[in-house]
A protein has these predicted regions:
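Conserved SAM-binding strand-loop segment of SAM-dependent methyltransferases
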Residues: 1-6
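C-terminal catalytic and target-recognition region of SAM-dependent MTase-like enzymes
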Residues: 7-21, 25-27, 48, 67-140
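Short, functional N-terminal and low-complexity linear motifs
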Residues: 23-29, 54-59
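Conserved P-loop NTPase nucleotide-binding/switch module
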Residues: 29-40, 76
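Glycine-rich S-adenosyl-L-methionine
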Residues: 38-65
Length: 140
């Protein structure tokens, strides 16, 4: 795996990755079971700012997923605004329209005994020509 921390690398890897995992920065509200006082430390401005950062990260890093490739967007938050709503909003953007929503899963601490967590699986659409080329390469 490789951690990408510059936009230069994102441009270099444009549509090159088979799989991308975005472990997005988040409010961390999924770990309230272990840190119950965390909810009192959060400010509304922080949540607003973190949602903007999440949208930017999702839009930027999705560009390195090649057609037919998969992207996982994950947070340790239980807030829909950081999770389902963030993915839904992304899918309406210019780059987001190039992806299909496959599935998502929300893990809640009171149901699972684990920390709260969210993950969504998206797949970048590929044209029939791109799919044909990919299948041909796999055969060779």
């Amino acid at each position: 795996y490789r951690i990408i921390d510059t936009t230069k690398v994102i441009k270099k890897l444009h549509e090159k990755a088979d799989r991308v995992l975005i472990d997005a920065p988040c409010s961390g509200l999924g770990v309230l079971k272990r840190n119950p006082d965390a909810k009192w430390k959060l400010q509304p401005e922080f949540i607003d700012n973190i949602r903007k950062v999440q949208a930017e990260v999702l839009e930027s890093y999705s560009k390195i997923v090649k057609p037919g490739g998969k992207l996982v967007y994950a947070t340790c938050s239980v807030l829909p605004s950081e999770n389902q709503e963030q993915v839904k909003k992304f899918l309406t953007t210019e780059i987001g329209k190039q992806f299909n929503f496959i599935k998502d899963q929300k893990i809640l601490a009171h149901e699972s005994g684990f920390d709260g967590f969210y993950m969504a699986l998206l797949e970048r659409k590929e044209s029939s020509e791109q799919k044909e080329k990919r299948v041909q390469k796999e055969i060779e």
